[in-house]
């Protein structure tokens, strides 16, 4: 009996010491510019996106590349745009990510003239083709336009917004009809959407409606918009960020930028006509979009730094102290409990 009591006491002391350690670490590093991720990074970025036409450099789809100018080796982010949008509609957001030392590759999978309206499965396969293009040709393009810059495909992340967010999950989960020649090392869903409702989802069906069911062994974060499910709902309940996060496994994270809408990370100007229409249709905040881009971009940079640069200080600090973000933020991570609201609706 005495041994049992001693064991219980020892476990209590260990757990309590671990609970105290994390806030101490955060307090120590709060003075070390934790919020730098929420400001433009230190890297100068290519003045204009590198535009690669279809078949140019053997590219399977037209794409843009945004890169730091400074010679070096950088992680790569493959980003899939949202429903009927253009990759160019995100150029300011991509510049923000690149300014923190990342190369962004963003294919264009939809066009109005001449019409190109791919199915979701088509989009997944097209994105897979672009992923397979990168080992052979990304460096060729970079050498042409930015001397001394290299993409590190050992640190390749897949991401996407809206329908493109679902495509990113589908690609990571193996739903492509095209065998991948690359390995994704991280996954970021930006307000992913699987359809208009549970009964009206696009094919293939990625969501299973079973908790922790996604067969993913890589780090995952899901970032949603708080107004995405407001009328007119462009990210409806049960087919958007909360459901995707629920189906992720242990150690994944979830953020909600509560005061912003589904399209609020897009450029203010230089938008495609459909992007303008979609932005007006979806619930939006009318707050500065630059703040949305800083918050979204900062979370993504902190997440990628944690897993690609072995520096998780900013990532964990944001989860534990949401007030570090430029706007209202909900954050949670499976396996961690900081005593906050358990859903963003409770804020």
UniProtKB/Swiss-Prot annotation:
User: GO: which molecular function terms?
Assistant: chlorophyllase activity
Organism classification = Eukaryota, Viridiplantae, Streptophyta, Embryophyta, Tracheophyta
Q: Which enzyme class?
A: hydrolase
| Keyword Hydrolase (UniProt) | yes
Question: What catalytic activity is recorded?
Answer: a chlorophyll + H2O = a chlorophyllide + phytol + H(+); chlorophyll a + H2O = phytol + chlorophyllide a + H(+)
Q: Which Pfam families match?
A: Chlorophyllase (PF07224)
- Please give the residues the UniProt entry marks as glycosylated: 215, 229, 251, 321
Q: Name one GO biological process term.
A: chlorophyll catabolic process
State the function annotated in the UniProt record.
Catalyzes the hydrolysis of ester bond in chlorophyll to yield chlorophyllide and phytol.
**Effect upon mutating residue 100 to A:** Severe loss of activity
Q: What is this protein called?
A: Chlorophyllase type 0
Additional note from the record? It has been proposed that CaCLH0 is transported to vacuole via the endoplasmic reticulum where it might be glycosylated.
State the span of motif (GXSXG).
160-164
* Presence of keyword Hydrolase: yes
How its function is modulated: the record gives: Inhibited by diisopropyl fluorophosphate (DFP), phenylmethanesulfonyl fluoride (PMSF) or p-chloromercuribenzoic acid (PCMB), but not by N-ethylmaleimide (NEM) or iodoacetamide.
Q: Which PROSITE patterns match?
A: LIPASE_SER
Keywords recorded for this protein, A-Z: Chlorophyll catabolism, Glycoprotein, Hydrolase, Signal
> Can you tell which superkingdom this protein's organism belongs to?
Eukaryota
Q: What is the effect of changing residue 262 to A/Y?
A: Total loss of activity
User: Which family would the database say this protein is a member of?
Assistant: Belongs to the AB hydrolase superfamily. Lipase family.
Mind telling me which residues form the propeptide? Answer: 20-30
| Positions of the catalytic residues | 162 (nucleophile), 191 (charge relay system), 262 (charge relay system)
Q: In which pathway does it act?
A: Porphyrin-containing compound metabolism; chlorophyll degradation
């Amino acid at each position: 009996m005495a041994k049992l009591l001693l064991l219980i006491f020892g476990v209590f002391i260990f757990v309590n010491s671990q609970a105290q350690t994390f806030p101490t670490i955060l307090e120590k590093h709060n003075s070390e510019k934790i919020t730098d991720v929420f400001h433009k990074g230190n890297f100068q970025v290519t003045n204009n996106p590198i535009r690669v036409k279809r078949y140019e450099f053997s590219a399977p789809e037209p794409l843009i590349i945004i890169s730091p100018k400074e010679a070096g080796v950088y992680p790569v982010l493959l980003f899939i745009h949202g429903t009927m949008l253009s990759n160019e509609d995100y150029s300011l957001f991509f510049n923000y990510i690149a300014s923190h030392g990342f190369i962004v590759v963003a294919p264009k999978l939809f066009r109005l003239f001449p019409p190109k309206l791919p199915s979701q499965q088509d989009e997944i396969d097209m994105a897979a083709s672009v992923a397979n293009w990168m080992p052979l040709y990304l460096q060729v393009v970079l050498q042409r336009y930015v001397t001394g810059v290299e993409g590190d495909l050992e640190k390749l992340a897949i991401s996407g917004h809206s329908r493109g967010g679902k495509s990113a999950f589908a690609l990571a989960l193996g739903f492509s009809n095209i065998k991948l020649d690359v390995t994704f090392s991280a996954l970021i869903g930006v307000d992913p959407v699987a359809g208009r409702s549970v009964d009206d989802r696009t094919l293939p069906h990625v969501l299973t409606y079973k908790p922790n069911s996604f067969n993913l062994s890589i780090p995952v974060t899901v970032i949603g918009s708080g107004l995405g499910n407001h009328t007119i709902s462009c990210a409806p309940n049960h087919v958007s960020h909360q459901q995707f996060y629920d189906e992720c496994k242990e150690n994944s994270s979830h953020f909600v930028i509560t005061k912003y809408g589904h399209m609020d990370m897009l450029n203010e100007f230089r938008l495609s006509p459909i992007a303008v229409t979609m932005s007006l249709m979806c619930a939006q905040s009318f707050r500065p979009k630059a703040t949305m881009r800083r918050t979204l971009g900062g979370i993504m940079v902190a997440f990628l730094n944690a897993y690609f640069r072995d520096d998780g200080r900013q990532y964990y600090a944001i989860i534990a102290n949401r007030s570090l973000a430029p706007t209202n933020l909900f954050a949670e991570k499976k396996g961690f409990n900081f005593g906050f609201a358990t859903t963003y609706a409770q804020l």
